[in-house]
Amino acid sequence: MTVNKLYNKKEDNLSDANYAINFNSGFCKKNDTSQMNRFKNKFAVVTGANGDFGKFCAEKLAEEGCSVILWDLKSTETLKTSLKKKYPNQLFQSHQFNICNEEEVIKHTNLIFSEFKKLDILFNNAGYQGDFKNTIEYSTDDFQKVMDINVIGAFIVLREVANIMKKQEPQGGAIVNTASMAGIGAPPNMIAYATSKAAVKHMTVIASKDLSPFNIRVNSISPAFIGPGFMWTRQVELQAKAGSIYFNEDPNLVAKQMINEVPMKRYGTIDEVIDPVLFLLSDESSYITGTDIKITGGI
């Protein structure tokens, strides 16, 4: 496979910086699943719906017939309006609140049950990467923030959604938690994030066993080096700033070294993350629970 590396940085704009890997897309062609309607007449909650993963997942669920409730700390009204316009026969709601607030999570899950009497799907995806620092320099405040969002918040959402899935008729549902390869590989300078994502993996396995009697499946994904987008850009920038892993402070060179760690010699794309998520949320994976899918290009 021919790999053509292009690294372009737009100065002083972290969210727009682009350290991109172009590759022969013929090796990565996707089957068109737009007409499969795997989620027709189902209801889903997507947390972190403003992020790359959350937004794309919401769009793909809607494309396959699902009604979607969007949860995020920031407003998702624009996404909701776009989905309503494109899929007028489905229902879409935008709920803006902090998943770390237990009372708010309970309130919004109860609203869903009182209005729709069902909830089939949860993409438990909201998260926070935190600082990129050596353990001895890492602040307690940021460590706590990472744990509050990635572990406590994710747990509260999982528990409350599972309660709906348990009491609805018929019982059951599918949940996918967003973990990370960081929770498996334990990278340096990411003590809070990596620890939190290791917790998410264990949470997934335990919840899958606890919830199986109610026909609720719980799985997780562990992505690594996914782009383009804010998270890829931020990771490259912070790796370069730290300088301790790749021994270089040039983001372009750091990006090249990061890609060289991947056996497939490229980063993954957002659709390559969400396709497995959709599989785990669908009836195609009806006998799969407690499983984590590594989406890493072979790392």
What are these regions (language model features)?
Residues 136, 185-191, 213, 265, ...:
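Active-site loop immediately N-terminal to the catalytic Tyr-X3-Lys motif
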Residues 158, 196, 204:
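Active-site helix of classical SDR
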Residues 212-217, 288-290:
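Short, small/polar-rich loop/turn modules that mediate ligand/substrate recognition or access, typified
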Residues 34-69:
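Canonical Rossmann dinucleotide-binding motif of NAD(H)/NADP(H)-dependent dehydrogenases/reductases
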Residues 180:
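Residue(s) in the substrate-gating loop at a strand-loop-helix junction
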Residues 133-135, 139-144, 258:
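Substrate-binding pocket helix/loop in short-chain dehydrogenase/reductase
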Residues 264-295:
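C-terminal substrate-recognition "lid" of short-chain dehydrogenase/reductases
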